[in-house]
Amino acid sequence: MIHKREPAAYMDVLLLADESEELIRSYMKEGDFYAITVDGRTAGGCVCTSPDESTIEIKNIALKEAFRRQGIGKAAIKKIEALYRNKGKTDVIAGTSNSSIENLLFYQKAGFRFHSIKKDFFLSYPEPFYENGIRGIDMVVFHKKL
């Protein structure tokens, strides 16, 4: 289901969750990349970083359209949580855009709670982006105890 891999070959998947290739390249170096597979096929990918000793941050998680709404993303999160819990992490955080309605639902259904808002976070992106007719401006940060 999740397999540690070199992220460069999965840029197309990571771009599904983050519009800035430049930013993806910067945080890919900071953490671990996991390919999410189903029956040997690449379904998606996830980049995890460690902002501090006790916390894991899901910097980017994305599934290809054909694999969405089947419980695969939630199962991948559970595997990642177990992996890092076994490494001594106690908390997991994840951020998404204020305009990413599906992601806001996804994280809550996966047991995350609202934690904070990073105002104007996405204004630093090279190009503005819109989802659901809403401009992505603020980052909504979610938290979950492991």
PLM segments and residue spans:
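Acetyl-CoA-dependent GNAT
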Residues: 1-65, 118
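Short, P/G- and charge-enriched loop/turn segments at secondary-structure junctions
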Residues: 21-23, 126-133
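Short hydrophobic/aromatic beta-strand or adjacent loop that forms the aromatic wall/cage
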Residues: 31, 136-141
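Short acidic/polar active-site loop segments enriched in Thr and Asp
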Residues: 54, 90, 113
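Conserved acetyl-CoA-binding loop-helix of GNAT-fold acetyltransferases
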Residues: 63, 69-82, 109
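Conserved GNAT acetyl-CoA-binding A-motif
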Residues: 84-97
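Conserved beta-strand-loop-alpha-helix junction that forms the acyl-donor binding cleft
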Residues: 94-104, 115, 119-125
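Conserved active-site tyrosine of GNAT-family acetyltransferases
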Residues: 106-107, 112
